[in-house]
Design a protein with these regions (language model features):
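Acidic, glycine/polar-enriched metal-coordinating patches/loops
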Residues: 17-110
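Extracellular beta-solenoid/beta-roll
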Residues: 1-12
Length: 110
């Protein structure tokens, strides 16, 4: 739904989400082990969609303990997605399972 969307990395380290509306909370759910993960966020043919909050879940579905479950972004500020119709942004994340911390960087405007 547009309020909460979970990107589940427990079975694959690469995911894709086509945005059809604004999302309040994106939750990245990670496996029990540390690793590198990637999600492509695609704007639909309308575009103009964004994500308000970027959060984490551990493998059991609980909020990540590190940083109160909030994704840590390069430069200290969460990305703003490219809102042009049919454009894509790639979010790359390193998940530190021991400390339940997600470090993210976005490559934008493809």
């Amino acid at each position: 739904d547009a309020t909460n969307t979970t990107i589940d990395f427990r079975h694959s380290n690469k995911q894709k989400l086509t945005l059809t509306g604004n999302i309040t909370n994106v939750y990245f759910q990670f496996p029990e082990i540390s690793g590198n993960f990637l999600c492509i966020f695609l704007q639909n043919g309308t575009g103009g969609w964004d994500v308000s909050n970027w959060k984490t879940k551990d493998s059991a579905g609980n909020a990540g303990n590190g940083n109160s479950g909030v994704v840590l972004w390069s430069g200290g500020t969460a990305t703003t997605l490219t809102e042009t119709a049919d454009k894509a942004d790639i979010v790359s994340i390193y998940w530190d399972a021991d400390n339940e911390l997600a470090y993210a960087v976005a490559s934008e405007n493809f």
